């Protein structure tokens, strides 16, 4: 395993940045108070599909799900799979709960989603090795200043952890619209090519969003601002 530098995200027991923005709307606060306790990832002990959902099923893990659009859409596409999402920002958690709750009409509730309000790596450590089918890291905070590079989730420590938790043949997906983070990510992933196979045959494979990859609000915002967006898929060796 790679020796991790001091300050690597896996060595830090804290989160950077804000954890709350605008006050929650009444409906969102109600979901945080009532639905979140029902679908929250347990705060201790092993995190397995059987414990979360009552039986074994393919597991997906999203690191920092934002407003939950991608997680909810994937969960709707794959109702027999289980989805775990972690997000430190309570406003994002509240928005994800809206997606999970559905409207009891055209969009029924999603029973295959579990949410952790807090540090994704804390939960990831408690998942058994080789248990995950997919891990998603979509439009993470780029921390563009060089002195903050160690705060990026795309670093050696988190990648070793992701590699350990993915089953052989499992898939790691990464998306960004930030050129500095793009270069950083490719540099880091090159160091981990013994663990991951890059699933790209030509430039189009990372310049066009693949099928089965729902758009996030951050991606939509980036496109509206004229940014180029890049999509990466790696398979666990």
UniProtKB/Swiss-Prot annotation:
The keyword tRNA processing applies. Keywords: Methyltransferase, S-adenosyl-L-methionine, Transferase, tRNA processing. It comes from the Bacteria. Pathway: tRNA modification; N(7)-methylguanine-tRNA biosynthesis. S-adenosyl-L-methionine binds at residues 62, 87, 119, 141. GO terms for cellular component: tRNA methyltransferase complex. InterPro entries: SAM-dependent_MTases_sf, tRNA_(Gua-N-7)_MeTrfase_Trmb, tRNA_methyltr_TrmB_bact. PROSITE patterns: SAM_MT_TRMB (PS51625). One of its GO terms (molecular function) is tRNA (guanine(46)-N7)-methyltransferase activity. SUPFAM superfamilies: S-adenosyl-L-methionine-dependent methyltransferases. Residues 1-24 are annotated as: Disordered. Substrate binds at residues 145, 177, 216-219. Its EC number is 2.1.1.33. Signal peptide: none annotated. The active site is at 141. It catalyses: guanosine(46) in tRNA + S-adenosyl-L-methionine = N(7)-methylguanosine(46) in tRNA + S-adenosyl-L-homocysteine. It is an enzyme of class 2 (transferase). PANTHER family: 3-DEOXY-D-MANNO-OCTULOSONIC-ACID TRANSFERASE/TRNA GUANINE-N 7 - -METHYLTRANSFERASE, PENTACOTRIPEPTIDE-REPEAT REGION OF PRORP DOMAIN-CONTAINING PROTEIN. Belongs to the class I-like SAM-binding methyltransferase superfamily. TrmB family. Catalyzes the formation of N(7)-methylguanine at position 46 (m7G46) in tRNA. This is tRNA (guanine-N(7)-)-methyltransferase. The lineage of its organism: Bacteria, Pseudomonadati, Pseudomonadota, Alphaproteobacteria, Sphingomonadales. The gene is trmB.
